[in-house]
């Protein structure tokens, strides 16, 4: 049964979750049963929902894995149905490399990256139509967007009736045996996952194990992708600063086990030929990045003084004092090393110590920032931030779109079950077996390219902390990387998009005028960086072949801090029904709850919100210093009018 609403718009799918009523029946999907395991299958549909370029194919589908009582030592009594969206390259897909894209969270859907950052289309402000993205990452690369771990986005364990509150951005399991409640502005109904935190991966390494199983099935048995180029890259963002190193190193370790015949099971012996790991605004390791949560709001290149000297000093003290953040992190890591060396998160004592470390550091580092009323993902924007636009949530709520996708579930941008599961074991406080910086070093030693790319307006995983990670790596090229200077990233004949330090296969780039979701702010710059890395060109100019010059290093200044930025105009406020918790004022939320809000295409027209105050700045003008690039965003016109801060799950 499907329901419609009797307001100014048809009520959508569950927004930060999902549901325009229930999805239509799944029809017309192709089913491929595994030749290795009768209980494994792939279901998919070809469609042109987002990629409309003539002759360029795209597919949505699921890889279905049954419960497993010995998943590399982890008992898993739930099914995994992992959603993917595959776009062939617009140019020569048969010979193009492939990149996986993963958003972070933990628990955030990769549809964020697809529709707000680097996919083939932008969603217009009617939440129904699309505009071609000329800077799409599938221009020359086959792109595979994956919703993971289980229950994220369109991925699910078991189909479950749910309701969704637009007011507090929460999904609830529902019992509709006595009838389905009518939908209204504040309550939507639909189909989702079980919401059971025990029915998903509970840490980064277990997520790596699951995604490796997905990859074994997809790359061997998905019939629509049979390339001549077998190179695979992973690009990720935010909490992907942990996903990326862990997943890529796990893939590489499994490759070694396949080669030395440690792994001999049929169907699990496909080599995943890793080429590149790219991390955008990654939260990688708190030991390297913790101090940046005090430094960035206090002293940044935009002259925004969100913190006083007293607040800055207090946070630094909480990091270093006895039983402070660093002490708790060290205790967690020592306990994990002794009590859970394989990262199964099945030791209650270790979980409790690490959960305490994670929550304590979060309190010390991030709670003070809430008082600033500035954006977590863009320090130059207000907390209720409408950029990048959330229009894709309404787009994915359309019955026609869900039908074309062949999805049995409504869209869920953030999986609460995943967040609970990861936070409950203190995943963010502890590294994996090698450590995430150790993983990056291992990948570099294995010949894998690694690129760290950071927008310079993001607070939550800011570039100052990212730079510290880059300088803290210990690998054979460490000294040469440190000696390299920062060079301009030349995007075109008239625009410099950032500064890069690069030596050989490793690079750190600061992208000007960009928040957390860098490609959403600077599509052209991001595409240039992405393609240069993918095709072995130097990031600064794109003219040198790094494969032929393995000792190449950039020259320039030791720091980038001398390059200052102008504060951009604050975006016009836009209250979007499906992102109400992150874009609407208290007055607007009240009107939504009472059913008095005037809504058009999911946008609250009345009551209207007023633009907030500009961020606080220093009294010293930075005009004497060089100015970064141009203050104008490169985002297309269709995106400039309205945008969104997705609800602060943890990281996107």
Curated annotation (Swiss-Prot):
Which InterPro entries does this one have?
AB_hydrolase_fold (IPR029058), Peptidase_S10 (IPR001563), Ser_caboxypep_ser_AS (IPR018202)
Q: What class of enzyme is it?
A: hydrolase
Active site per database record: 238, 458, 516
* GO biological process terms on file: proteolysis
Q: Where is this region: Disordered?
A: 607-627
Q: Which UniProt keywords apply?
A: Carboxypeptidase, Cell membrane, Disulfide bond, Glycoprotein, GPI-anchor, Hydrolase, Lipoprotein, Membrane, Protease, Signal, Virulence
Q: What subcellular locations does the record give? A: Cell membrane
Disulfide bonds, paired cysteine numbers: 50-121, 325-361, 332-354
Identify the GO cellular component terms for this protein: fungal-type vacuole; plasma membrane; side of membrane
Pro-sequence residue ranges: 630-652
Where along this sequence does the record place binding of substrate?
461, 517
Cleavable signal peptide: 1-19
Catalysed reactions, semicolon-separated = Preferential release of a C-terminal arginine or lysine residue
Listed PANTHER family: CARBOXYPEPTIDASE, SERINE PROTEASE FAMILY S10 SERINE CARBOXYPEPTIDASE
UniProt lists the family membership as follows: Belongs to the peptidase S10 family.
Protein name (database record): Carboxypeptidase S1 homolog A
Organism name? Trichophyton equinum (Horse ringworm fungus)
């Amino acid at each position: 049964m499907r329901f419609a609403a009797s307001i100014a718009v048809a009520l959508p799918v569950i927004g930060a979750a999902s549901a325009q009523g229930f999805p239509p029946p799944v029809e017309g999907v192709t089913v491929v049963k595994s030749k290795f395991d009768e209980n494994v299958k792939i279901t998919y549909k070809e469609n042109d929902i987002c990629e409309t370029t003539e002759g360029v194919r795209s597919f949505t589908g699921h890889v279905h894995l049954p419960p497993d009582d010995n998943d590399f030592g982890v008992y898993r009594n739930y099914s995994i149905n992992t959603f993917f969206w595959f776009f062939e390259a617009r140019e020569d897909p048969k010979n193009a490399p492939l990149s996986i894209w993963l958003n972070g969270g933990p628990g955030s859907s990769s549809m964020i990256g697809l529709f707000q950052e680097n996919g083939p289309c932008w969603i217009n402000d009617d939440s129904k139509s699309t505009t071609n993205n000329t800077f799409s990452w599938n221009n020359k690369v086959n792109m595979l967007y994956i919703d993971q771990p289980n229950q994220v986005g369109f991925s699910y364990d078991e189909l479950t009736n749910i309701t969704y509150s637009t007011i507090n951005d929460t999904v609830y399991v529902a019992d509709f045996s006595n009838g389905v409640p009518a939908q209204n502005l504040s309550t939507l109904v639909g189909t989702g996952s079980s919401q059971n935190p025990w029915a998903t991966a509970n840490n980064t390494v277990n997520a790596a194990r699951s995604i490796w199983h997905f990859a074994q099935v997809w790359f061997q048995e998905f019939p629509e992708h049979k390339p001549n180029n077998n190179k695979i890259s992973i690009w990720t963002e935010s909490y992907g600063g942990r996903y990326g190193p862990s997943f890529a190193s796990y893939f590489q370790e499994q490759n070694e086990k396949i080669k030395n015949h440690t792994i001999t099971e049929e169907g699990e012996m496909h080599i995943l030929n890793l080429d590149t790991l790219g991390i955008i605004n990654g939260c990688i390791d708190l030991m390297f990045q913790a101090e940046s949560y005090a430094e960035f709001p206090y002293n940044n290149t935009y002259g925004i003084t969100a913190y006083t000297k007293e607040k800055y000093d207090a946070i630094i003290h909480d990091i270093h004092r006895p039983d402070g953040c660093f002490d708790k992190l060290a205790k967690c890591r020592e306990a994990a090393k002794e009590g859970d060396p394989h990262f199964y998160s099945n030791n209650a004592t270790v979980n409790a110590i690490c959960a305490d470390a994670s929550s304590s550091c979060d309190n010390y580092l991030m709670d003070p920032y809430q008082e600033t009323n500035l954006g977590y993902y863009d320090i130059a924007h207000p907390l209720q931030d409408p950029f990048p636009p959330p229009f894709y949530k309404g787009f994915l709520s359309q019955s026609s779109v869900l039908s074309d996708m062949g999805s049995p579930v409504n869209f869920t941008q953030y999986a609460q079950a995943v967040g609970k599961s990861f936070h409950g074991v203190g995943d963010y406080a502890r590294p994996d077996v090698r450590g995430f910086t150790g993983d990056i070093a291992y990948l570099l030693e294995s010949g894998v390219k690694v690129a760290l790319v950071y927008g310079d307006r993001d607070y939550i995983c800011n570039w100052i902390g990212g730079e510290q990670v880059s300088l803290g790596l210990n690998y054979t090229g460490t000294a040469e990387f440190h000696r390299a200077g920062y060079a301009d990233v030349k995007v075109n004949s008239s625009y410099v998009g950032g500064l890069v330090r690069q030596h050989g296969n490793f690079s750190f780039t600061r992208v000007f005028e960009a928040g957390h979701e860098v490609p959403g702010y600077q599509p052209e710059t991001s595409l240039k960086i992405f393609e240069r890395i993918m095709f072995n060109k130097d990031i600064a100019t794109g003219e040198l072949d790094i494969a032929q010059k393995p000792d190449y290093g950039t020259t320039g200044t030791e720091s980038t801090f001398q390059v200052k930025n102008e504060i951009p105009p604050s975006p016009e406020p836009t209250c979007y029904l499906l992102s109400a918790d992150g874009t609407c004022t208290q007055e607007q939320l009240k009107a939504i709850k009472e059913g008095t809000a005037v809504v058009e295409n999911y946008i609250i027209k009345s009551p209207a919100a007023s633009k907030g105050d500009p961020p606080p700045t220093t009294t010293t003008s930075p005009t004497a210093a060089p100015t970064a690039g141009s203050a104008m965003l490169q985002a297309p016109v269709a995106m400039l009018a309205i945008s969104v801060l997705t609800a602060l799950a943890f990281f996107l």
